[in-house]
């Protein structure tokens, strides 16, 4: 993500999603985890449908509807190229400008509905979902409070019964930390054993 700060605005250019690449493990509504890929062309078709129906796609902060930063009718350009969904925007929001100065913008995420997908069993025991089509509702800038589900750049948010389900692709920091604890623990153990391994290697070298 490229961030260019100017006196009265910030220019941001980056990829919301790189297509055909696995996400981080995402928990579904039942707590079961899966990985996901958005297939090439899915975003392009979603953008075409939105344009045909005169529906602007919003730019939000952290998927919060009360923190709208713009839309595709004003300050946001969205396009799918050979890498994925690219977003280019100009933002004058003071909070976002401050977060940009402080290096607190982590990346992008997106919210969508009506996913058409195929599933398969992945090698690591998780399900892998291939999203072939979707209706793009919004794209979001993600700050230090969340982590994008797609590393190249979760939770499923269910609305009440009168609205459609909207899936978002970012995780709370606390949730992501829990997911990564086992790897953190391994690194901590390896680091604590390092001095002893070095001493053992020196003793073995002297004996030889």
Regions found by a protein language model. Give the residues of each.
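Protruding loop/beta-arch "assembly-hinge" segments enriched in small, turn-prone residues
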Residues: 142-208
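Polar/acidic, low-complexity leader/linker segments enriched in S/T/G and N/D
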Residues: 1-51, 156, 166-186, 191
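Glycine-rich, flexible loop segments associated with nucleotide phosphate handling
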Residues: 32-41, 55-57, 127-132
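A structural microfeature
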Residues: 69-74
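Residue microenvironments linked to proteolytic maturation
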Residues: 3, 11-13, 75-172
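Acidic/polar N-terminal loop/beta-strand segments that form early-domain functional surfaces
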Residues: 15-17, 60-64, 90
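Short conserved beta-strand and strand-loop elements enriched in small hydrophobics
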Residues: 53-67, 108
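Flexible loop/turn segments at secondary-structure boundaries
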Residues: 22-23, 67-68, 117-119
